[in-house]
Amino acid sequence: MISPLFFASEGGFGLNLDLFDANIVNLAIVIFGLYKFLPPFVGGILERRRVAILADLKDAEERLLKATEALAHAKKDLAAAHQKAEQIREDCKLRAEAIRLDSEKRTVEEMARVKQGATADLNAEASRASAQLRREAARMAIENALSALPGKLNADAQAQLVSQSIKNLGEA
């Protein structure tokens, strides 16, 4: 059996079996304890969390600043690379144009040289053919004259004509 010391009605320290009164007293004790002891504990946790969040924000801002600077530097480098590429492209165009003009000039000069050479060869061949035709015509004329003259000329006139023909052939 339960000893009478546990009951409050007996006048000693005991258990209060009235649940509503007991719960109100217990809630008052718990609320007072939470009010007294919880703020420093929860405040410390919240303060540490606030410091961590501020540190994370500061770190994120620093990384954003570095990334922004890196992006600006990369954009500047890209612009410089585009400018250099454009300069190289322009230089190549100018060089290609100079090479093309030089090639055209050399081609025209070579064509003129070949034309002069062909003209000189043609003139030389024409001169040679003309000289050969003159010699052949002179030879044939002399042969015809010599074959026709023996009956028409005397020996002195014939000798003089042969000498003059030989002299003319030597000059030609």
Curated annotation (Swiss-Prot):
Disulfide bonds: none
Entry-linked InterPro entries: ATP_synth_b/b'su_bac/chlpt
Cellular component terms (Gene Ontology): plasma membrane-derived thylakoid membrane; proton-transporting ATP synthase complex
Membrane topology, as annotated: Single-pass membrane protein
Transmembrane segments: 27-47
Keywords: ATP synthesis, CF(0), Hydrogen ion transport, Ion transport, Membrane, Thylakoid, Transmembrane, Transmembrane helix, Transport
Gene Ontology MF, one: proton-transporting ATP synthase activity, rotational mechanism
Compartments where found: Cellular thylakoid membrane
PANTHER family: ATP SYNTHASE SUBUNIT B, CHLOROPLASTIC
Family indicated by similarity: Belongs to the ATPase B chain family.
Free-text function comment from the UniProt entry: F(1)F(0) ATP synthase produces ATP from ADP in the presence of a proton or sodium gradient. F-type ATPases consist of two structural domains, F(1) containing the extramembraneous catalytic core and F(0) containing the membrane proton channel, linked together by a central stalk and a peripheral stalk. During catalysis, ATP synthesis in the catalytic domain of F(1) is coupled via a rotary mechanism of the central stalk subunits to proton translocation.
Assembly behavior: F-type ATPases have 2 components, F(1) - the catalytic core - and F(0) - the membrane proton channel. F(1) has five subunits: alpha(3), beta(3), gamma(1), delta(1), epsilon(1). F(0) has four main subunits: a(1), b(1), b'(1) and c(10-14). The alpha and beta chains form an alternating ring which encloses part of the gamma chain. F(1) is attached to F(0) by a central stalk formed by the gamma and epsilon chains, while a peripheral stalk is formed by the delta, b and b' chains.
UniProt-recorded name of the protein: ATP synthase subunit b
Species annotation: Prochlorococcus marinus (strain MIT 9303)
Biological classification of the source: Bacteria, Bacillati, Cyanobacteriota, Cyanophyceae, Synechococcales
Gene that encodes the chain: atpF
